[in-house]
Design a protein with these regions (language model features):
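Glycine-rich phosphate-binding loops of nucleotide-dependent enzymes
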Residues: 1-133
Length: 133
């Protein structure tokens, strides 16, 4: 007898997400669901609103309308730190690195709760993360 598949938990839900800039509607009532373990690609022409959508999800700026939920909890990110605390981050096409920092320091900069760097711990964390992936 086959065991029924357990429904995947929704990690991210977007409902009616809209973002407008002067003279432009970048995103118009976007609905999107992402379940645990899924991988999606957002495709579109230049200026289609892909980066705008991802920037709202990552907390870089708020939506003008709509609702976003992370694991069922309604969220209104006002900055990237809030998104990171919910395990949402964004890797930019063009890396924004701090030139005077080491690789380890650049990697750890976006981590929640980091006030002072213990480089020995940072190097260990990076080793552990790189072994997982």
């Amino acid at each position: 007898m086959e065991t029924p598949l357990k429904p995947l938990q929704l990690s991210l839900e977007l409902r009616g997400i809209t973002k407008k800039f002067p003279g432009i509607v970048a995103n118009d009532s976007v609905d999107f669901d992402l379940s645990e373990g899924e991988i999606h690609t957002i495709l579109g022409e230049n200026g289609a609103g892909k980066s705008t959508l991802m920037s709202m999800i990552a907390g870089l700026f708020p939506a003008d309308e709509g609702e976003m939920r992370v694991f069922g909890e309604k969220v209104n990110f006002t900055n990237p730190r809030q998104a990171i605390e919910k395990s949402i981050g964004m890797v930019f096409q063009h890396f924004m690195l701090v030139k005077n920092h080491t690789v380890a320091e650049n990697i750890i900069l976006g981590q929640p709760g980091v006030v002072r760097l213990n480089l020995k711990e940072v190097h260990q964390q990076i080793r552990e993360i790189s072994e997982r992936y």
